[in-house]
Amino acid sequence: MRITWIGAALASALALLAGPLYALQPPATLALACSGPFAKNSSHLKLAMFFDSKNITFTDIKYADGSKVPASVLFPNDQKRRLEVWWSNPTARSNIHLIVIGGQSTWAAPGGLRLGQTLEQVEKLNHKPFKLKGFDEDRIATGSDWDGGALATVAGGCKLGISLRADAKASAEKIDALSVDEEYSSLDPAIRAAKPTVSEIVIGY
């Protein structure tokens, strides 16, 4: 009886070992690092092996201007866990070019960046103020310089970029006064008055 139990337990253990690493080691939080499955030399196959092939697809990402970018998408049917991975070699689906956190995704980027964070929260992660461009026609401002802060250097050799959307209550007049062609400090009173929050995070190699 004991031998039978041990045999069954061993069979179960071997079955687990044959499964994807994500199933064996599910992350406590969806935290992204520029290493492991998200290292520069990763591939669609490596992501499929880590997260399970049923949780990834390769498709064209469509943008409002009509352009398309071929990319691997993790958890395509789960807006909270969705993650886009663009490849330097799209044909081979290898060597990461960009990782995009957008929409309603709850992934945390290196350094603790998350969607929805305020200027003050990003400054705290950076350990100092940073610079950003003014707002475009969609009320989006783009981070332009971490100014030597903590987010300027990330382990693994990747770079962090963010976009911030102005608060819906910020007046069009105040937003238009902050030119997209100009660079501002995150401490600028006019920028802070717009109360922008992080709307997209890009991790690039």
Where are these regions (language model features)?
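Bacterial N-terminal signal peptides
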Residues: 7-19
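Short helix/turn-capping signatures at newly exposed starts of structured segments
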Residues: 19-205
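Positively charged n-region of N-terminal signal peptides that target proteins for export
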Residues: 1-5
